[in-house]
Swiss-Prot record:
InterPro entries for this protein: ACP (IPR003231), ACP-like_sf (IPR036736), PP-bd_ACP (IPR009081), Ppantetheine_attach_site (IPR006162)
UniProt KW Lipid biosynthesis keyword: yes
BP GO annotations: lipid A biosynthetic process
Post-translational modification: 4'-phosphopantetheine is transferred from CoA to a specific serine of apo-ACP by AcpS. This modification is essential for activity because fatty acids are bound in thioester linkage to the sulfhydryl of the prosthetic group.
Pathway terms, separated by semicolons: Lipid metabolism; fatty acid biosynthesis
Alphabetized PANTHER family for the sequence: ACYL CARRIER PROTEIN, CARRIER DOMAIN-CONTAINING PROTEIN
Role: Carrier of the growing fatty acid chain in fatty acid biosynthesis.
Modified residues (O-(pantetheine 4'-phosphoryl)serine): S36
The keyword ATP-binding belongs to this UniProt entry's keyword annotation: no
Residue ranges occupied by any Carrier domain in the UniProt entry: 1-76
Organism per entry: Chlamydia abortus (strain DSM 27085 / S26/3)
Origin superkingdom: Bacteria
GO CC terms: cytosol; membrane
Record protein name field: Acyl carrier protein
Amino acid sequence: MSLEDDVKSIIVEQLGVDPSEVTENSSFIEDLNADSLDLTELIMTLEEKFNFEISEQDAEKLRTVGDVLAYIKTRQGQ
């Protein structure tokens, strides 16, 4: 499974959205109707899955699916 598929699967499961709604440009709040609790749970799940901590400062910048993918790729490249 690719990184994109992994992240999409987590988002679908955490937010209860249809997989077809999850694209790189999807905004968690505007497009996927996530609230702050949803986003906190999503960040925690991503941290657990990818085995690194996402700072509160970084988490606030993760507004779209593409933002999350780019962030994970950067962190994995370290």
